[in-house]
Amino acid sequence: MARVRTYHNYNEAWGEWRRLGIPDRAFTRFDLASRQFIFIDSVSKEEVSALQEELAPKKVTVLPCRGDRALVAITPLTLESVLMTGASPRVMEMGEALRFRNDVEPPAFEWSGGSLDLSRPRVMGILNVTPDSFSDGGRHLDADAAMQSALAMKDEGVDIIDIGGESTRPGSSPVTPDQEWSRISDVVKRVSEEVGLPISVDTRRPEVAKKALRAGAVMVNDVSGLKDGMIEVVREEGAAAFVMHMRGEPSNMQDDTRYTDVVGDVYAFLEKRVREAVSAGIPRERLGIDPGLGFAKDVDGNLEIMSRLDELRSMGRPVLLGASRKAFLGKIAGGGPEDRLDASLAAAAVACWQGVHLFRVHDVKETVRTLKAASAMRSGISPR
């Protein structure tokens, strides 16, 4: 499992290398400018030795790190040369990660009977049918009110509507599957019949997901990372799914926000869950990933993820980001949930610049406009 690491400056690189146990000044500033740095995660000492032996003739540096990782410093031209002359599976992983990271083409995202073109950023509008969600709790308990919001989001340019019946904010209490389904059942059916857009069901319960998919939803947004029977439901119903990173439960997830390397640890979790889902029969093209901002992360962890979102693209799966109105934005910019629009749009622009594909948001119109501008600036091509 490989992921491409891009450093913004030498101080950032040196700080991380020191934290991961890489010898001081193992690389120079010239190395930082001339080489591609690729982490290989979940690697044994024997595999590191084999990599060092394989790549030594090409004068490629391979260093072991804390946390069962290795760091490879290689020029893209050298990597291409190694791949063309035959390479081990680990080196093949490096080539694949670099190809995905450089976005040769956008990843496919499909479900039974449909697909979504990710050649431009896509917006997922939040429709919480809950009394206690952190931002819009209580606004859509009535199916008519929920429908009005769904239609308004459609007019504003939303691409997916994400319907949820359980709050998963930090410290929230769980509801029963029956309670969750009773909240969203009419909304899922009506939005499916009357709005004409793909519907995602935001749930961590397989029984709720199955009912929603049979009522018209086409994808599952699962904050628990496809656990406890969810893989089977997604496979059997031909749905797409987003795999999110979280530790623990919403009620206790903020009790432990410590990581060796937050992005590396999140990446390893997501890659493992994607691999398990594919092994269980879900086509890879039906899976997206979400780093889970605010779920078992503190402010610094969230900011580190925001600054390194491009690494997630090394997996070759669509990246979904849920930064909208999150508490960490309030802690750095001030304001309650209703006062975080500007910070939310800043997060969307930063993520767009790093190639994030989908954005789960409360403020559809403003986000659509921000992404249109940010995408045009990133590509240098005006929108058609």
Question: Predicted segment positions?
Answer:
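Active-site-adjacent loop and "lid" segments of alpha/beta metabolic enzymes
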Residues: 1-57, 68-70, 111, 118, ...
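Non-catalytic propeptide/linker segments at domain boundaries
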Residues: 68-114
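Catalytic domains of carbohydrate-active enzymes, especially glycoside hydrolases
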Residues: 148-164
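Phosphate/pyrophosphate-binding loops at sites that engage ATP/ADP/AMP, CoA/4′-phosphopantetheine
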Residues: 154-155, 273-286
